[in-house]
């Protein structure tokens, strides 16, 4: 995947309710973690399909994370996204 600069990516990420907050408030006990979620197709589809399971997606690159945010077209309380380098994941969990 070729990374492209997205103008205003940091502002979009900082304003989004799904990013880097509320992980400890997820509604379900069962949780799946996807490291390197890319543009989010897989994790968003599964969050819609399985509302009783939590999904946490991790992505390192702002421009890719913005593309995932743009695909969220409904309220998904069981989905959270982390803008994070997977090498530092132990600081979150």
Predicted regions and their residues:
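A short acidic, Gly/Pro-enriched loop at the edge of an enzyme's catalytic core
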Residues: 92-93
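S-adenosyl-L-methionine
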Residues: 1-31, 41-48
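SAM cofactor-binding core of SAM-dependent methyltransferases
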Residues: 30-88
